[in-house]
A protein has these predicted regions:
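Intrinsically disordered, low-complexity charged segments of secreted bacterial virulence
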Residues: 1-21, 27, 31-34
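Short, conserved catalytic or adaptor-binding loops enriched in Gly and charged residues
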Residues: 2-4, 73-76
Length: 192
């Protein structure tokens, strides 16, 4: 339904093998864009409940970034792609799911096990974005919200190259780094 309403959105991941769908989509072309961002949502995010809002957010972020580049001298030809990554089973704490599911969600959100497992997939997703490009690496920005910021922070610490240049965290419970310099060194190392 969302893709039909927005034919310019690219489906990058669709996994039906788990308890809930996992998906990623892009506004713009991440294979050719100068700047690419990957947004990871947090607790209570599901493809069914979150994709509409995340598509709207991706389109809006792309438009805003493109306008800002157009205003900067010598940057008007740079392009932007924004990706929404609901590629993990985020913890769920919803009254509609009943008390046992809420307790399970509370346990999941109080530990980093779900985020740590998802971090492996997210790190590979970042690396895959860069590997799929024929024109050299993109300026890749990792964006994490809420529990998604923990997932993003852990993904940036996975050994190996992920190609992320910058990271943004908001509404964050923490990023599981001993100090800000840990993430800065990993991002700078991968951006080189």
């Amino acid at each position: 339904r969302v893709l039909a309403a927005h034919p310019d959105i690219r489906l990058m991941l669709l996994d039906t093998s788990g308890k809930r769908l996992r998906a990623a989509f892009a506004a713009g072309n991440p294979d050719t864009a100068t700047h690419v961002s990957v947004s990871v949502p947090g607790m209570n995010s599901t493809v069914a409940d979150s994709v509409d809002g995340m598509v709207t957010e991706a389109i809006g972020l792309r438009q805003l970034a493109s306008r800002q580049l157009a205003w900067l001298p010598g940057r008007a030809r740079e392009t932007v792609a924004t990706i929404g990554w609901i590629g993990y089973q985020a913890p769920q704490i919803r009254a509609r799911d009943g008390l046992p599911a809420m307790v399970q969600g509370a346990v999941e959100v109080s530990h980093d096990d779900v985020a740590a497992a998802a971090a492996q997939d997210l790190s590979r997703f970042y690396a895959g974005i860069q590997a799929a490009r024929d024109i050299g690496p993109a300026h890749l920005t990792a964006i994490g919200h809420s529990y998604g910021s923990l997932t993003t922070g852990l993904a940036l610490q996975v050994p190996g190259g992920h190609g992320v240049s910058d990271a943004v965290f908001y509404g964050s419970p923490g990023v599981a780094a001993a100090a800000p310099g840990v993430l800065r060194r990993r991002v700078e190392q991968d951006a080189d």
